[in-house]
């Protein structure tokens, strides 16, 4: 089994964090993983994306030309990555911030008002976890429990107080896709 995903948005939206969480959780499950970040040329507020591959066998390359899935936080990322997802792939969209529908009928598309859900949980900064939960609710290359474990690696010190609300945000994303 090999699964790959591109995660894309603006810098500061938590794009890299959820990519690192997926990679770390995969490692904790004994899987082969790669995490490849990419940043736009801007110092602040620019685009950022990362590619994550989780596999049972060694991974030939971390580069994704036709990802199986994409999680997109903003319109710019949506416009860039929708055309390159493989046929039958998954596209998870924050419908709070993205004002158009996918143009491809050959994709499984999840429109989730992730920013709205995160705001209801107390802070729009949890949008990344809501989107990750929606992704894991549809395709589970790794378990939610492993992601919970990985949270404690990245949220340390004062940020450790945010672990429980991040778990709630993950679950809110899972619940959203499972209701449909």
Task: Give the residues covered by each predicted segment.
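Active-site cofactor/cluster-binding pocket
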Residues: 1-180
């Amino acid at each position: 089994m090999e699964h790959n995903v591109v995660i894309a948005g603006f810098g500061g939206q938590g794009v890299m964090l959820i990519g690192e969480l997926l990679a770390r959780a995969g490692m904790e499950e004994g899987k082969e993983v790669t995490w490849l970040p990419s940043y736009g040329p801007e110092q602040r507020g620019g685009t950022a994306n990362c590619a994550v591959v989780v596999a049972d066998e060694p991974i030939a390359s971390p580069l994704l030309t036709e990802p199986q899935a994409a999680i997109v936080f903003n319109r710019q990322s949506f416009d860039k990555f929708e055309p390159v997802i493989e046929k039958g792939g998954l596209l998870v969209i924050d419908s709070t911030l993205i004002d158009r529908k996918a143009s491809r009928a050959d994709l499984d598309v999840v429109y989730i008002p992730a920013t709205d859900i995160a705001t209801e949980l107390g802070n729009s900064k949890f949008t990344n976890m809501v989107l990750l939960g929606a992704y894991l609710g549809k395709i589970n290359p790794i378990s939610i429990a492993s992601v919970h474990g990985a949270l404690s690696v990245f949220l340390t010190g004062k940020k450790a107080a945010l672990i429980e609300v991040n778990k709630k945000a993950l679950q809110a994303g899972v619940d959203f896709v499972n209701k449909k």
